[in-house]
């Protein structure tokens, strides 16, 4: 990395983190100082399981709310409950942290999630070089990742597990890949966009990768048996918790645009189209399939900015393959430019946001809206890019994807 690039990246990191600190100080991640709301329910749910209590119970929910708000949500009129909304096995990877006090566990979680995020960049690229270091630095300069680290959002854990499974499958380590894949389903909306193309690839090359599918099924049954033994009837309680959770979070982008009934129908069609596309492109590069899957899932699942770390997958694919797009391929070049403008714009927006925070109420409002707006712009450009590559692929790019796919098949 050149010195000038290193200086720019360092400035970008500093500006983005300062902006995020201003933002979190204004909105306050929790009403009670020292408590990060996103991580506490998972930690407390794990603790409840060790104490042989029901993590979905009203008592545990109220403990989460008192930790976050200083009182129950009902007592202060807050509609946002702090329920345990994970499947039971989501607690397994972090179970040792529940033996520690929350402050210590939270500190460990911060560094664990940061390491997993950095490793995910290298795992996606399949190599460790200066470009990977640059990608890592820019990843830690993105607001969604910064927020996830600030709040210890478990999405980073399950994203890291899913990408780790992806890398192991690509490297031919099928049984460890299956184990990590099952553990990553502790947050299904994060795991499924990665697991679907992995399963498609495994079924398409059944003789080479059948051990992955068999191991995935076997370990899933083992985990299911353990969860039922730990908490009988947990599925019913989990579904009830999810139903309550969906009442106060944002709907998917498709539902937001088209309304509940039409949006749900379109989402179903998009999901079926995704499965069909993955199968039709089953001989394509696995990272390309995962990138396409991620952008479609981002349209059809409830939209949360902190899940935008998933967009790292299509961004890495796009940047690593940008050189294959011919200069005269104006359509693809324009889409690539739009994606890069959205990326650079998100970092510039953070710098602008720092200034706006210290101006008028209108300035603060604009600064407040910047992170979500830039993520949507990036998502929009990625959706267009991936759809165009599926429908009207660049010839050089298509040839490279097929070659890369055959190369991976031989490893």
Where are these regions (language model features)?
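Signature aromatic-anchored transmembrane alpha helix within multi-pass, membrane-resident enzymes
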Residues: 7-12, 217-221, 326-350, 382-385
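Membrane-water interface at the C-terminal end of transmembrane alpha helices
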Residues: 384-397
């Amino acid at each position: 990395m050149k010195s000038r690039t290193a200086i720019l990246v360092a400035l970008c990191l500093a500006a983005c983190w300062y902006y995020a600190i201003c933002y979190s100080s204004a909105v306050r991640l929790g009403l009670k100082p020292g408590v990060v709301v996103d991580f506490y329910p998972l930690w407390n749910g794990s603790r409840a399981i060790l104490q042989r209590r029901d993590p979905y119970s009203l008592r545990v929910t109220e403990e989460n709310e008192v930790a976050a708000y200083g009182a129950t949500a009902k007592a202060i009129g807050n509609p946002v409950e702090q329920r345990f909304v994970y499947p039971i096995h989501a607690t397994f990877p972090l179970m040792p942290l529940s033996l520690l006090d929350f402050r210590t566990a939270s500190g460990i979680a911060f560094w664990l999630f940061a390491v997993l995020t950095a490793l995910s960049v290298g795992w996606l690229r399949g190599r460790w070089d200066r470009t990977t270091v640059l990608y890592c630095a820019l990843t830690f300069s993105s607001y969604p990742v910064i927020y996830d680290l600030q709040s210890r959002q478990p999405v980073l854990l399950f994203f890291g597990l899913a990408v780790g499974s992806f890398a192991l499958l690509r490297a031919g380590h099928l049984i460890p890949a299956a184990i990590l894949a099952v553990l990553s389903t502790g947050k299904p909306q994060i795991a499924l966009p990665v697991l679907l193309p992995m399963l498609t690839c495994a079924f398409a090359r059944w003789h080479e990768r059948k051990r992955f599918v068999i191991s995935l099924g076997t370990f899933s049954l083992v985990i299911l048996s353990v969860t039922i033994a730990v908490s009988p009837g947990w599925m019913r309680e989990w579904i009830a918790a999810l139903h309550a959770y969906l009442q106060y979070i944002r709907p998917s982008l498709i539902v937001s645009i088209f309304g509940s009934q039409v949006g749900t129908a379109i989402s179903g069609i998009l999901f079926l189209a995704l499965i069909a596309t993955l199968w039709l492109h089953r001989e394509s590069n696995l990272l390309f399939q995962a990138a396409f899957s991620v952008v479609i899932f981002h349209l059809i699942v409830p939209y949360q900015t902190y899940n935008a770390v998933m967009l790292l997958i299509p961004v890495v694919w796009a940047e690593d393959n940008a050189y294959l797009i011919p200069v005269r391929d104006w359509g693809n070049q324009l889409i690539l430019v739009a994606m890069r403008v959205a990326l650079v714009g998100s970092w510039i927006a953070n710098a602008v946001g720092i200034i706006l925070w210290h101006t008028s109420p209108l300035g603060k409002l604009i600064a407040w809206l910047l992170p979500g707006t830039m993520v949507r712009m990036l998502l929009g450009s990625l959706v267009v890019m991936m759809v165009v590559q599926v429908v009207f692929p660049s010839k050089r790019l298509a040839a490279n994807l097929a070659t890369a796919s055959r190369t991976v098949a031989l490893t």
